[in-house]
Amino acid sequence: YAPRRGMVYLEAKNDQSSKLFFPSYKSLVAINAKDGKYIRAFGDNGVVKLKKPSITAPAIFEDNVVITTSEPSLEVYNLNNGKLLWKFILMEKKFRRNGGKRYDYSGGNPWGGFSLDEKRGIAYLTTGNAGRYFNGVNRPGKNKYANSIIAIDLKNKKKLWDFQEV
């Protein structure tokens, strides 16, 4: 299992309790910050199942929880009920055969987490290399969004720009 690198605290508003949100492998978990109990209204009794693992700290933007996953993607969930609102997929999975075996040639995962400009509603994330890390022969081309810094407009649900470092 992959390590988790943080959580986010949401201070109580109105009658609600303060909450903690954190990834737990293929789950996004919400607990009450005061007593450690699951927030039952969030997802399935406090847990949202993810398609792929998330290992970095989430962020709160407006009424949403924002996470990155190894799909690779940036995903936005309603912080009250855990419903997936939208996602930005960073790199489509590509499978190729090599010597009779099937390999995943995607990658470009946002391992390092992301920064959030709350005022402007922009998430800035960084990505790693494209898949089959030590041999690039089977992944020719630009490998869009791999080894990149990407700015995503959370209000308008779109990419603003990307800068590929290599």
Residue ranges and their predicted role:
Residues 1, 13, 28-52, 74-104, ...:
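Extracytoplasmic/lumenal domain signature
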Residues 2-27, 53-74, 102-138, 148:
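Repeat-blade elements of multi-bladed beta-propeller folds
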